A protein has these predicted regions:
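Glycine- and acidic-residue-enriched helix-capping/strand-helix junction motifs
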Residues: 17-33, 121-127
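Structural motif
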Residues: 53-66, 157-161
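Short, acidic/small-residue loops that bind anionic groups at enzyme active sites
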Residues: 92-118, 122-133
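Conserved small/polar residues in nucleotide/adenosyl-binding loops
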Residues: 180-182
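A charged, well-structured terminal subsegment
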Residues: 134-168
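Short beta-strand elements in bilobed, periplasmic/extracellular small-molecule ligand-binding domains
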Residues: 38-54, 144-150
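Short, well-structured alpha-helical segments in soluble
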Residues: 61-75, 91-93
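Periplasmic-binding protein-like
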Residues: 74-84, 102-104
Length: 182
């Protein structure tokens, strides 16, 4: 029996910026890939998550959101701010996004390494700051979205993402639904 969700995918877009240099962008990309693989391998999500890269500029955000709008397989977009991602760079893309949006407010690491933490770690792992600013700009713009707060590997977080994915699939099906009233 075919899974009705197999025809769909949800795109995962990470927010960052080039301020911290190329090594940071490489690390952000590696963390994002690990998260997407972990989400898909959890067995808890009905729709495949596809990593669409790290957006480091307004133009990159706009391009990926336009592509999401034009891809029938994409039924929603998950955003995550790995480092401090300036909220203003998301404005034009958010204005154009027509697909359901989930803001995943999480950290890559479950535990904070208090004993070894240094400025490099802090610069790379600013999800709390970036996610708050992203949430603020979405609220100011009145962007409809689902916000999921919690560690990305936890059962409750995965459950909330899965529920949202099923809603996205229903939304996608309704976009070309023909009804006849008798």
């Amino acid at each position: 029996m075919n899974n009705v969700f197999d025809q769909y995918e949800v795109w995962f877009v990470t927010g960052a910026q080039l301020l911290y240099g190329g090594d940071a962008v490489i690390a952000v990309d590696a963390h994002s890939n690990e998260m997407v693989n972990g989400l898909n391998e959890s067995g808890k999500l009905p729709v495949k998550v596809v990593y669409k890269g790290t957006a480091n500029s307004s133009k990159e955000v706009e391009a990926v959101f336009k592509a999401a709008n034009n891809d029938d397989k994409c039924v929603g977009v998950i955003t995550w701010m790995h480092t401090f991602s300036p909220a203003k760079m998301w404005i034009h893309g958010l204005q154009q996004l027509k697909k359901p949006l989930l803001h995943l407010h999480t950290q890559f690491n479950k535990e904070i390494p208090w004993d070894t933490m240094d400025m490099d770690f802090m610069n790379l792992n600013q999800s709390a700051h970036g996610d708050r600013e992203f949430g603020h700009i979405c609220t100011r713009m009145r962007i409809r979205r689902k916000v999921v707060v919690g560690y990305w590997k936890e059962e409750e977080t995965l459950h909330k993402i899965a529920v949202w994915m099923r809603v996205c699939a229903g939304w996608a099906d309704s976009q070309d639904l023909s009804l006849i009233h008798i």
